[in-house]
């Protein structure tokens, strides 16, 4: 991503000259305040939108020069607004790789925590998810989305971590899945959880104006005592809160 500028409305720029280099096989976490363009960056990589200026490249090729089929073969998406079709749970996972074996399906289900969902549902794998996946909770829908990414085995995975609090079981499964994805693919995560941020090889800190404020490892950014350290201290403090 080089000198990328983007706005949904011309009078309100979202990204202002963003540079982002993601080495193959690495994990990059993007953090920053709400509305700074973190999720927008993922959507530009996936070409949900085209940049206003600059370029997004994968392997040196501008995504605008890639066919939709080629781009989708290279990239998997795990976004917060997971959409499931009114089809069976099995087919909603298999859509990522229709030729996958039963063994492969069950392996990714175990990794993503979908097996627990299957066991809870009366119809198991053949349960209809309902339009938009309304038969499942938000955390369960994200598990299905992660299972899709694991089954697809795309070289690049874009993951927009849920901002809402997940129960302990969902949280554990998401972290475990991120660890697996990190071993298999180049992983770009919009991160909100401290544990996820610490897993990254590189952390990109966005400021409220849509610019990159800081870049580095966790230890490097803590030593800078800048925006990332403020972010870390506030999140760390809030994680210690208890109701009494």
Model-based region annotation:
Residues 1-244:
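ABC-type nucleotide-binding domain
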């Amino acid at each position: 991503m080089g000198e990328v500028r983007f706005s949904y409305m011309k009078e309100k720029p979202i990204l202002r000259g963003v540079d982002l280099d993601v080495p193959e096989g690495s994990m990059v976490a993007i953090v920053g305040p709400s509305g700074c363009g973190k999720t927008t960056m993922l959507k530009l990589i996936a070409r949900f939108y085209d940049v206003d200026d600059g370029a997004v490249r994968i392997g040196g090729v501008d995504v605008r020069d890639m066919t939709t089929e080629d781009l989708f073969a290279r990239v998997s998406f795990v976004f917060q607004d997971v959409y499931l079709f009114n089809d069976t749970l099995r087919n909603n996972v298999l859509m990522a790789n229709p030729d996958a074996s039963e063994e492969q399906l069950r392996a990714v289900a175990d990794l993503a925590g979908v097996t627990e969902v299957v066991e809870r549902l009366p119809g198991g794998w053949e349960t209809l998810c309902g339009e938009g996946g309304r038969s499942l909770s938000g955390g369960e829908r994200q598990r299905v989305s992660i299972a899709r990414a694991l089954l697809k085995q795309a070289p690049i995975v874009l993951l927009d971590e849920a901002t809402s609090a997940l129960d302990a079981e969902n949280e554990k499964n998401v972290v475990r899945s991120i660890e697996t994805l990190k071993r298999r693919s180049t992983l770009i995560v919009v991160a909100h959880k401290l544990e996820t941020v610490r897993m990254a090889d590189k952390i990109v800190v966005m400021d409220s104006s849509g610019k990159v404020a800081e870049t580095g490892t966790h230890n490097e950014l803590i030593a800078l005592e800048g925006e990332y350290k403020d972010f870390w201290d506030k999140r760390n403090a809030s994680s210690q809160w208890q109701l009494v």
